[in-house]
């Protein structure tokens, strides 16, 4: 996800609405790979990190995403992983709304955030349906 977005920043302004497609393409490609007939997917979380790393020097979106992943993996541990991922991306999207209003001020980056987050959540929908209530655990780690 990093390389296409980083290269595209030399040709398309990240504040251009066309840039949304550039950012969404690697995530969709990893979620629904052509090679596997659009059925088996994976690594769209990694691709989403790469996509937002490609926005160098604007690293705030990927830093916020990394913060939420670390928070729900180390401080407030949520298991199973699919639930942790969904909660992480929801928190990331909400935080990015406020970051866009007060700091970033780029609607295309916000829309990319929401679309990428929705794609990741949608891909984890099946795993969420298979989770039984007794499997869900929230553990708060103290320093």
Show where each model-derived region lies.
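Interhelical loop and helix-boundary elements at the membrane-water interface
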Residues: 1-3, 30-48, 76-90, 122-143
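Nucleotide and nucleotide-moiety/phosphate-recognizing core
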Residues: 1-36, 56-60, 76
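Interfacial segments of multi-pass membrane proteins
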Residues: 8, 45-80, 91-102
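Hydrophobic, aromatic-rich alpha-helical transmembrane segments
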Residues: 15-16, 44, 57, 61, ...
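Hydrophobic alpha-helical transmembrane segments
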Residues: 19-24, 48, 61-66, 86, ...
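Alpha-helical transmembrane segments of multi-pass membrane proteins
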Residues: 25-30, 68-75, 116-123
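Alpha-helical membrane-embedded segments
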Residues: 102-123
């Amino acid at each position: 996800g990093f390389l296409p977005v980083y290269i595209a920043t030399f040709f398309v302004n990240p504040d251009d609405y066309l840039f949304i497609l550039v950012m969404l393409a690697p995530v969709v490609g990893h979620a629904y790979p052509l090679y596997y007939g659009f059925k088996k997917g994976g690594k769209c979380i990694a691709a989403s990190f790469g996509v937002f790393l490609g926005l160098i020097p604007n690293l705030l979106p990927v830093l916020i995403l990394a913060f939420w992943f670390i928070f729900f993996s180390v401080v407030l541990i949520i298991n199973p992983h699919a639930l942790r991922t969904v909660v992480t991306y929801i928190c990331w999207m909400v935080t990015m709304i406020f970051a866009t209003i007060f700091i970033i001020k780029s609607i295309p980056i916000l829309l990319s955030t929401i679309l990428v987050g929705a794609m990741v959540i949608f891909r984890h929908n099946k795993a969420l349906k298979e989770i039984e209530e007794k499997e869900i655990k929230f553990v708060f780690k103290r320093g």
